[in-house]
Curated annotation (Swiss-Prot):
The gene is petB. The chain crosses the membrane at residues 32-52, 90-110, 116-136, 186-206. Heme 1 (or BH or b566) is high-potential and absorbs at about 566 nm, and heme 2 (or BL or b562) is low-potential and absorbs at about 562 nm. Heme b 2 binds at residues 86, 187. It is a multi-pass membrane protein. Pfam families: Cytochrome_B (PF00033). One of its GO terms (molecular function) is metal ion binding. It comes from Nephroselmis olivacea (Green alga). This is Cytochrome b6. Heme c binds at residue 35. Its cofactor is heme b; heme c.
Length: 215
């Protein structure tokens, strides 16, 4: 086993990487309120795990979506628990994100030289809201359907480009199968990928610049 480790160590310098990760200086003013960002990340990972589990049973069609969610809740082993955890962690993620934003703002963590860290955080906040909008529609019940109809209809008030934007969001002039397919693709592939990319950027900048000092 040691020979295998030595082989990787010689090429990747694993010990140096481990030492750098475990020996990072943490300022003495850091307290429990600085944990909100980490809790948000934890909620996202829970979302990924539980969401991935549900993709095995969910069917993104207007005729089968609601029935597949019902099947998850009533027939799949621990399906009710997995979906409930997905919903609870979604709410927790939004709440922790809001608290994290307030903490960063109140402690001046957005100021020079951390402007780009703040920008990536704002982008992540927008993506998080988009998760909520797209995920809300997936059961395709009455609440989800009308929520999608209202949200996708908002851009219609924009002069000139409003109508094309609505059609782009819905996939057609009205809410239907194309809309559900787009929202499902956004919720399960596009948004998670964007979140992973911007989270990586966010953490690398925090790692490089360190935690902001007290006011």
């Amino acid at each position: 086993m040691s020979k295998i480790y030595d082989w990787f160590e010689e090429r990747l310098e694993i010990q140096a990487i481990a030492d750098d990760i475990t020996s990072k200086y943490v300022p003495p003013h850091v307290n429990i309120f600085y944990c909100f960002g980490g809790i948000t990340l934890t909620c996202f990972l829970i979302q990924v795990a539980t969401g991935f589990a549900m993709t095995f049973y969910y069917r993104p069609t207007v005729t089968e979506a609601f029935a597949s969610v019902e099947y998850i809740m009533t027939n799949v082993n621990f399906g009710w628990l997995i979906r409930s955890i997905h919903r609870w962690s979604a709410s927790m993620m939004v709440m922790m994100l809001i608290l994290h934003v307030f903490r960063v703002y109140l402690t001046g963590g957005f100021k020079k030289p951390r402007e780009l860290t703040w920008v990536t955080g704002v982008i992540l906040a927008v993506i998080t809201v988009s998760f909520g909008v797209t995920g809300y529609s997936l059961p395709w019940d009455q609440v989800g359907y009308w929520a999608v109809k209202i949200v996708t209809g908002v851009p219609d008030a924009i002069p000139v480009i409003g109508a094309p934007l609505v059609e782009l969001l819905r996939g057609s002039v009205s809410v239907g199968q194309s809309t559900l397919t787009r929202f499902y693709s956004l919720h399960t592939f596009v948004l998670p990928l964007l979140t992973a990319v911007f989270m990586l950027m966010h953490f690398l900048m925090i790692r490089k610049q360190g935690i902001s000092g007290p006011l």
